């Protein structure tokens, strides 16, 4: 039997080694909530939602646009607007360098994408955050493009939808980034006078200056399940008030229970829900 031990194991090792070499990397994803190992292709087909526990993974802005809008007749607005560096800001590396590297990596000029299109044949203007662009932070370009989205919706007499995914104001632009809170809120005040619906969708995370301005000004505020929503983070609040926060504090379910948001909708149902809401809110 010794020849079996000496011959077969090495052969098996060689075969397994060859198989491993032929298997491409990055085929699997472990769910951070339930630890289930998921095939990435299946996860993508399920809109980045875990088929086992329903956990909503973060999704890119482009994927979300493709998920929400009808395929034909999409028009992007403001895609050539680029941020500047008014403060010549420098932390671990210069702001300009950070911008350039992020723009090249994502092929986006900034953290907000504005697209005119249709949801189930209903005209809409959609503004979607790209969280991978510096944490979806709001600077001058995000503010400008959001106002552009508002103006386009007014011009088209259609609903405005914003999908937020942001850590807040962009510190590298200082006071200019904080001014966008007032700028975007003022634009929505104008928008409301036209009696057109603004639907705000809060995904994980929606924090800081974005949550403290236009993200919470929707006629209808929708959140994705378990999304983190708030101004300061839980650890900051706990260290300030010196108290333990309630279980699930700042999660979508907690906010719904306390009347901060209107509804929680599974990502796989959001397109249908939006079409129904817009039909009721803007029958014309």
Q: What is the role of each PLM region?
A:
Residues 105-111, 136-151:
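Glycine-rich anion/phosphate-binding loops
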Residues 117-129, 145-169:
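A structural preference for short, pocket-lining loop segments at secondary-structure junctions
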Residues 48-52, 58-59:
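Short, small/acidic-rich helices and loops at N termini and domain boundaries
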Residues 28, 47:
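Residues immediately within or flanking Cys/His clusters that coordinate Zn2+
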């Amino acid at each position: 039997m010794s020849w079996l031990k000496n011959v077969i194991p090495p052969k098996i090792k060689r075969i397994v080694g060859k198989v491993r070499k032929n298997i491409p990397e990055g085929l699997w994803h472990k769910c951070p909530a339930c630890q289930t190992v998921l095939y990435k292709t299946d996860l993508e087909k399920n809109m980045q939602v875990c088929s086992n526990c329903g956990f909503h993974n973060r999704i890119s802005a482009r994927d979300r646009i493709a998920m929400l809008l009808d395929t034909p007749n999409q028009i992007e607005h403001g895609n050539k607007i680029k941020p500047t560096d008014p403060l010549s800001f420098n932390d671990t590396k210069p702001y300009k360098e950070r911008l350039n590297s992020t723009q090249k990596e994502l092929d986006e000029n900034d953290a907000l994408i504005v697209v005119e299109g249709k949801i189930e044949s209903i005209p809409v203007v959609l503004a979607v955050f790209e969280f991978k662009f510096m944490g979806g932070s709001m600077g001058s370009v995000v503010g400008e493009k959001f106002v552009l989205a508002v103006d386009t919706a007014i011009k088209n007499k259609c609903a405005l939808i914003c999908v937020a995914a942001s850590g807040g104001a962009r510190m590298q632009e200082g006071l200019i980034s904080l001014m966008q809170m007032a700028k975007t809120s003022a634009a929505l005040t104008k928008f409301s006078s036209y009696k057109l619906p603004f639907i705000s969708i809060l995904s994980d995370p929606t924090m800081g200056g974005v949550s403290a301005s236009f993200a919470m000004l929707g006629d209808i505020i929708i959140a994705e399940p378990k999304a983190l929503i708030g101004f300061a983070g839980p650890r900051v609040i706990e260290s300030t008030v010196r108290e333990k926060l309630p279980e699930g504090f700042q999660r979508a379910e907690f906010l719904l229970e306390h009347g901060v948001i209107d509804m929680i909708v599974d990502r796989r149902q959001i397109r249908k829900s939006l079409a129904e809401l817009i039909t009721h809110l803007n029958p014309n």
